[in-house]
Regions:
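Conserved short beta-strand edge segments in small beta-sheet-based binding/regulatory domains
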Residues: 12, 47, 78-88
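Short amphipathic alpha-helical segments
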Residues: 26-30, 67
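Short amphipathic alpha-helices in soluble, non-transmembrane regions
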Residues: 33-40, 70-79
Length: 88
């Protein structure tokens, strides 16, 4: 994954940040598990929940490797309901 993250630094035009709305109210442990799972996907450089708005996630990814629907699929694959809001 470090190589993918360095690619984003090397090619910033490939970096896209999106907002995803998570329907469930997730506890701290489940949020951490979801972030770890997403950051383990090749092409995703970072994932985080917005402080005080725990239903919103900011996810950075390499658009040469993934598209927004694939990122959303990665979220939903972790047994949560979510919708793509759009780019930041």
């Amino acid at each position: 994954m470090g190589e993918v993250a360095s690619n984003l630094k090397q090619y910033p035009a490939r970096n896209v940040e999106i907002i995803v709305h998570v329907d469930e109210m997730l506890g701290e442990t489940k949020r951490a598990e979801l972030v770890n799972a997403l950051e383990g996907i090749e092409g995703i450089s970072s994932a985080e929940f917005c402080p005080l708005r725990w239903h919103l996630m900011l996810i950075n990814y390499d658009r040469e490797l993934l598209n927004s629907q694939q990122v959303l699929t990665g979220v939903v694959a972790n047994n949560v309901h979510a919708e793509l809001i759009g780019p930041v």
